[in-house]
Amino acid sequence: MGKIIGIDLGTTNSCVAVMDGDKPRVIENAEGARTTPSIIAYTDKETLVGQPAKRQAITNPKNTLFAIKRLIGRRFTDAEVQRDIEIMPFEISKADNGDAWVTVKGDKLAPPQISAEILKKMKKTAEDFLGEPVTEAVITVPAYFNDAQRQATKDAGRIAGLDVKRIINEPTAAALAYGLDSKKENQTIAVYDLGGGTFDISIIEIDNFDGEQTFEVRATNGDTHLGGEDFDNRVINYLVEEFKKQGVDLRNDPMAMQRVKEAAEKAKIELSSAQETEVNLPYITADATGPKHLNIKVTRAKLESLVEDLVNRSLEPLKTALADAGLSVGDINDVILVGGQTRMPLVQKKVADFFGKTRKDVNPDEAVMAIGAAVQGGVLSGSVTDVLLLDVTPLSLGIETMGGVMTTLIEKNTTIPTKKSQVFSTAEDNQSAVTIHVLQGERKRAADNKSLGQFNLEGINPAPRGMPQIEVTFDIDANGIINVSAKDKNTGKEQQIKIQASSGLSDAEVEQMVRDAEANAEADKKFEELVQVCNQADGIAHATRKQITEAGDALNADDKAKIEAAISELETAAKGEDKAEIEAKIEALIKASEPLMLAAQAKAQGGEQPQQSQKDDGVVDAEFEEVKDNK
């Protein structure tokens, strides 16, 4: 069985880890970093992911996508999406199914399709390290992700060529990583996870017995649209409004806004360790009076005043999670802070004040989620046997009943996997069919909750209202993904639905995206092969010219003209994109260069160099032979 990798698919950064023996190991990417920016850029020739995409963001703002996790599994009409439309430099558009998608160069792309590019990068990073294909993964998601968002994350994995064996909640993954370093007495921990785009709080009990650890999530809560991006946006707005006093609104200039975004993020980070910083962006824009420069001083106090309400927003879920777990602040042994935004002193102070104790950092480089996911991968593959994980469903599940009320079947914070049934009946006499409308949320009114889908159970025998017995069963798997069935106990007729969420991608759409991804992989491979053969052509042309110079008069004029013509034809071919033609021109140059080799040998034999040196000087021979080997 191959390795199951652990992937932290983050809003701002992503990371991959794997069990290396009995220890999880974070794998460095091709750029040598443990984390990869969750940024994707589409250029005319290729798709860039990670640091290469980030480097060109200023000059390509409309086609450089970031924070896509904030859109995954969301409807275009969601209030959070509408807010993002106002601030994102790229175009967020409405898909035919009502989802929030992104339009790039005239093409509509689904968030799972875009996220798959990051997952493919993580997959290749792991494959390069392991030296073998990787097909299975555990992927982290915010604990407060609903069913649509979880399903969309699984779709992203599938598009990337991964069988997602488990979706694991981020705070739970952090607890697993924490537990590895803390095999001591039983304890209850609070995991406060404020990342780039989402916030979660989980209350987790860790029981240690006879060398085995049980991680039981008691309660979870959060906000799937609260994170570092929101903090950045407050700083961006402040800088733009301050600069507006010069009479120029930078919001009309996408390239300028991208520079401001980078500077705002940098300033926010610097203010975690400094009391003040200066944002200096020369030549940010220009008007009729000439170039304009942005130079604004930002203090830590100013930053805190801009974002204090966001930090306070994170405290309400803490109270709810503790209440749901039936615990008080005094019952918490340790507070674990994870996510890049928790480096902010104001966040640390507010959390410390709330719990009455200082926090503990698990891993400052944010690789902690991937480590936990890798441990779960080890559990699933059988390489880790002393860990048991008991997670929960973050939101209540139920159906719409008479009067537009949501009747809950499975309460939030129920340990998963779980299954529950309840008997309902008809609302009218002789009703022959019922519609089962599946909901997720905490509101009493059905319309105020998230609709996950609906289906009909037909063929009910005529009977007075209230007489037929319709058994509705909810079945939640370990990924938190839901199956719902309805059965007429009188006739035995049954109908069921695997909730894909009414805002999700259909199987056909996912399959098409898988095929597109495979096609792109083939195109990427061809592009890489073309670059390699062009480099070979350039090297051979350069080496051959050098040999012509060294041969001097030993090479006759006709042979020299033929070789130079072959070089010219090769260089012309190398400017195109026909790999076969370039290879043919390489072969033609090799053939045309045979007299050059003879001339070089004759000249060498006429000199004072020993035979061994003649062999060593056969540079062209070695290069020609190498090209043949590569074909």
Swiss-Prot record:
Keywords (alphabetical) are: ATP-binding, Chaperone, Nucleotide-binding, Phosphoprotein, Stress response
Membrane-spanning segments: none
Q: Which SUPFAM superfamilies match?
A: Actin-like ATPase domain, Heat shock protein 70kD (HSP70), C-terminal subdomain, Heat shock protein 70kD (HSP70), peptide-binding domain
The role this protein plays is:
Acts as a chaperone.
Family according to the record: Belongs to the heat shock protein 70 family.
What PANTHER family does the annotation carry?
Answer: HEAT SHOCK PROTEIN 70KDA (PTHR19375)
Name this polypeptide is given: Chaperone protein DnaK
Tell me which species this is from. Mannheimia haemolytica (Pasteurella haemolytica)
